[in-house]
Amino acid sequence: MQFQKSIRIDADTDTVWDVVAHQFDAVGEWSSAVQSSGPNPEASTPEGATVGGRVCATDFGDLKETFTAYSEENKRFTFEVTGMPSFITKAQNTVTVKPAGANASEVSLNILMETNAIGKIMAPMFKIRLTSTLNTFLDELKDYAESGTVSAKKQKQLAKAAA
């Protein structure tokens, strides 16, 4: 399965790159798809990156995301995900940040997943859920990169976790 999603963000590429790359391990601070996140101490840090990967608490369980490619110059990185449901045998995501006009950026996600036989049967349902999650993720990234504030959904999640 392959998914491609992108969004235009009204913030310069350096600002957006800082959020998605330099604050890679802090995704749990603004994305409601991630209850909490932190650096993956087992991952080697690529040149230019602040961490080698992250560990995310999600509805799927704890996921480890580790950089497999990273380019500050091209504002592009790829990470591999482990800890997915057992029917997913490989998951990786390539994130690219490009200029999209004056003081604007385009963030592209290119996700590749390989599945076993059970995964092929479950793929249509999983694709619907993942598409919804990715749309919310990109909308929340846009809000956070443009304003520095988290979505109402994430605010509720953080308040519930603090209670």
Residue ranges and their predicted role:
Residues 82-136, 143, 152-154:
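Beta-strand/loop substructures that line and gate deep hydrophobic ligand-binding cavities in soluble
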Residues 1-46, 162-163:
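Hydrophobic ligand-binding cavity/cleft-lining segments
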Residues 13-14, 69-74, 96-106:
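A short, structured loop/turn motif at beta-sheet edges
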Residues 5-7, 64-69, 91-99:
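Hydrophobic/aromatic beta-strand elements that line small-molecule binding cavities or substrate pockets
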Residues 13, 20, 60, 127, ...:
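A structural signal for well-ordered alpha-helical scaffolds and beta->alpha junctions
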Residues 28, 38-86, 136, 140-147, ...:
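Glycine-rich portal/gate segments that line the openings of hydrophobic small-molecule binding cavities
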Residues 1, 59-63, 89, 103:
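Short acidic/polar mixed-charge low-complexity motifs
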